[in-house]
């Protein structure tokens, strides 16, 4: 079988070279000849690398043994295929990230440019608005002036026309005398169009002045015929000739009529301006001032612009400026002060017929460890003293005791430690009777004397309770004798002060003490009105973790009920709960009862007065005013120094080292006592600076504040939560926990003593006499000396004496015995000595040797 048969049988074409492409083109020649020309088109074949895994991937590229391009490139770089792929991916990822960063950078730049353009546009709009308002104000003023001038001119023109008409009437009447029997009737003069327009407020321009009957105007020569196209149009020739009357349009006449109507309404029939009484406080915004005057804010702003001040609606004006604005707008000014918000907060005393007897409030005061809390425990049959840290009371406790006869007494247990002076002062101010507890074995102590002074300053009667009479070394008579030095004369010594010998341990004399209290209360005739809103004093406050701000209040008069709105110091809130000393919920609290309240927005300062107000708005207003005053008092800038002494004192104060501290305590009174004690420790060189002293546990904000201030945190009877502990550990903030105030004061005192510069003391050690002076080449002058007294040590301080006069004071540079350096030379021994930076040595001079020692300083107690 032939190849042709095979091809035909398989249906395939025979193999042949395919031309790259071509065709025939008819080519024309001169004289009508043409020829068919074969055209061949050549095409270029472009070789491209085959894709990975493609059909030709293993055969192309010229790699040895069918190796792929990727493997060849990897082998060329000394990498594996996976490493090359990873590198290519990393490069692609880096390029993509770079492209993303570039796009983000362009986007940020566009946003920044857009924001800058927006700010610039807002600034330009604000400037345009201010300029537009000024321009409108100026145009309004100019328009008013023009209207006034126009109305005046119209009035003068009307008067002139009326006078000319009257003259014409008189002249015509003289020419033609009327008949005797003929009745005179007013002659009606026809009004031309120009006069009608003038009456309506229009304006007519004439060449010869005002129109009216009179001599005939001089006739103008006839003009040549003009083009009708220029008819009715204003030309230069018409302006020069001026014989044609030109009038305003009907719309202009209508506007003039409306202006005249508006003017008549403003002068005669318009509404009258109302004069108001405007209350002007110490500071007020422009919008609020305009609202109180019932004026537009734009008018007030325009007025201030005329005065040369650029203000906005929310800008604050002082009282003097606001008063001038109100007076210029025609209103009555009523000046008030910010302190007026507290008017009526504490009412006057009640009428005697409305008062009822109340329980006395007793403050137990005295020196620390004299048994005040134990005496109260004996009266209440409780045991509180054993549960207190260190066995001392560190905040005021309020309790109410019911005696056997049914009489109730409210006790306030005040701390006796020296740090709680402010608490004792509050206790004396808030009570009716002071029980002065003095230990029979310890007699009068400093805090006893302080308690006496507090009671006398408050005018509170005193009952002396001589405690611990059961001890063998007790001497009650010595106590009463020592009290005479402080003007406390008891009844046993012909005085007026009651005294009772008691023992909290054996309960001796408790009945006599209660009888003395009842007698003193009966003499005081204590009464209060329970049927009124409650008023009283804040005894203590704290921030409880579960209950929030808690304040202990002593009701002096009235009845405090649940749900009422209370303002206590700079805090306010609605009473959510009333809790007595036993932890029981009460619906209300009457006079002489101490209760804890919940619901305030913060812990008030102890010693502040509290009262019930009628609305939340008034409570918020009073609290905001007090908080603002507190911020001004603590953050106000000191006035500039007016003398050299004040400037030097301030510079000296700036050089004082400060120890920053952050104090958190269980109650506000303890924080106040710690702050007062620590601030009194320092001197002119070092002092404690309390960054914050507040009740409540240590939280994260306290740690951050301590970190920024470089201060440790002192936690008194409180703990830090978990987040605060972790943050303090990360930031390196030290948190110290205390339960006794002694330890706080001692630690701070020791730390501040370490900050003091040590005291330098000079200690004399010996004398030496110069026998001969030698000049050494490298060393300089060296004195050959004999130690006459004491000892001379190398590096000690020296003074050169000549004729008992100190010529030089410095340090000993060299001390030699023969040719050897020695550490010291004793009396009777010769040595060689050289001074630092001094060589004026002579035979016979005396050398005084001394040492400077540093002694740690102590702070005064």
Curated annotation (Swiss-Prot):
Residues 503-505 are annotated as: G5. It is found in: Cytoplasm. Residues 391-395 are annotated as: G2. GTP binds at residues 366-373, 413-417, 467-470. Residues 53-65 have a biased composition (Gly residues). Residues 366-373 are annotated as: G1. It comes from the Bacteria. GO terms for molecular function: GTP binding; GTPase activity; guanosine tetraphosphate binding; translation initiation factor activity. Residues 357-527 form the tr-type G domain. Gene3D superfamilies: P-loop containing nucleotide triphosphate hydrolases (3.40.50.300), Translation factors (2.40.30.10), Translation initiation factor IF- 2, domain 3 (3.40.50.10050). Keywords: Cytoplasm, GTP-binding, Initiation factor, Nucleotide-binding, Protein biosynthesis. Residues 1-69, 92-273 are annotated as: Disordered. Residues 467-470 are annotated as: G4. GO terms for cellular component: cytosol. Residues 94-108, 121-155, 163-186, 255-273 have a biased composition (Basic and acidic residues). Its main location: cytoplasm. Residues 109-120, 213-223 have a biased composition (Low complexity). One of the essential components for the initiation of protein synthesis. Protects formylmethionyl-tRNA from spontaneous hydrolysis and promotes its binding to the 30S ribosomal subunits. Also involved in the hydrolysis of GTP during the formation of the 70S ribosomal complex. NCBIfam families: IF-2 (TIGR00487), small_GTP (TIGR00231). PANTHER family: TR-TYPE G DOMAIN-CONTAINING PROTEIN, TRANSLATION INITIATION FACTOR IF-2-RELATED. Belongs to the TRAFAC class translation factor GTPase superfamily. Classic translation factor GTPase family. IF-2 subfamily. This is Translation initiation factor IF-2. It comes from Maricaulis maris (strain MCS10). The gene is infB.
